[in-house]
């Protein structure tokens, strides 16, 4: 693959478990071996519990400040939901308070932030889903990725469904939630620029857009894949 590197994306797994030194080394390695455009988009995926925990042992005042110093200029944070019961149902490591605290801190240091929200969760009413979206918007986040809940085999959630303790996700509910999502985000200035992604102008993910435009990319690490055109 030849050409200038336009984006660097630390995907998951959970790359926020890496130390700052390790992340900085990986970024520098890209610069050492490839030509990189000026001011590339450099994204780090992270979970709220990691970010809140890392801030307690940050080298400077905040882990977010540390990330800025080593070259990260975009964060993708796996919020999933702001409701405690949803997070517990999905067996997430963070809680609602950590999700909000994480975004409060992140927005002090980063303008370019994306968060993930899950819809179609059993027991989630349309009103509750609207509250999730409203909470996300209240932080001034310029990009939201949203996906329907999928139930994987051999997970705690799947066991709860199989034993009848909770209902299975319903396609018609997920469809309603998606329509609510589109309407609310477009009303608030977001563009539905890709199947699961919504962004304000100048905040579309360059990395995601490159996939859809058929640009070449190199994947590095376990289960990573590349595309050479």
Predicted ranges, named:
Residues 1-229:
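C-terminal scaffold of the Radical SAM
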């Amino acid at each position: 693959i030849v050409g200038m590197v336009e984006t660097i994306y630390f995907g998951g797994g959970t790359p926020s478990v890496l130390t700052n030194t390790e992340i900085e080394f990986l970024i520098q390695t890209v610069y050492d071996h490839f030509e990189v455009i000026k001011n590339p988009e450099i994204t780090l995926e992270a979970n709220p519990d990691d970010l809140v925990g890392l801030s307690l042992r940050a080298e400077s005042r905040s882990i977010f400040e540390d990330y800025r110093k080593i070259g990260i200029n975009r964060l993708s944070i796996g919020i999933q939901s702001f409701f405690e019961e949803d997070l517990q149902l999905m067996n997430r490591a963070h809680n609602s308070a950590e999700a909000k605290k994480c975004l409060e801190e992140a927005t002090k240091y980063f303008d370019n932030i994306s968060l993930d929200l899950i819809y179609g969760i059993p027991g989630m009413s349309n009103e509750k889903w609207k509250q999730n979206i409203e909470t996300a918007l209240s932080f001034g986040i310029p990009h939201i990725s949203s996906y329907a809940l999928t139930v994987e085999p051999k997970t705690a959630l799947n066991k709860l469904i199989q034993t009848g303790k909770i209902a299975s996700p319903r396609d018609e509910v997920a469809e309603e939630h998606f329509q609510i999502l589109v309407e609310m985000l477009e009303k608030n200035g977001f563009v539905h620029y890709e199947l699961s992604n919504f962004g304000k102008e100048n905040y579309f993910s360059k990395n995601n857009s490159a996939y859809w435009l058929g640009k070449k990319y190199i994947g590095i690490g376990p289960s990573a894949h590349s595309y050479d055109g």
